[in-house]
């Protein structure tokens, strides 16, 4: 459905795209293959979301705006990681950023999948198990 798409250039998952770039840069994956791989992923992401909804906190399809924002976030994360990884304080900052992004992903996954969370809202403000 067109109205159910994510039309935002940047959202909380932009952190996750940036953090993935940090991990790849720290793993010594060269910039061009990493960035091209991410563009390729963005091209198939919606299809993967449709087939494997359980691992996505938000399985709505992305509009072109969001794909562009994800690519920008990834590239910015890679460039920032390259610059910051040269110093111990930079490495600490990058580690914290990756941990924050992982927390965002896990928190949203727990919030959107009732099979992970024993507590569910009933729609009346009450919570049931």
Question: Predicted segments — roles?
Answer:
Residues 1-64, 68, 72-129:
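Bulky hydrophobic segments
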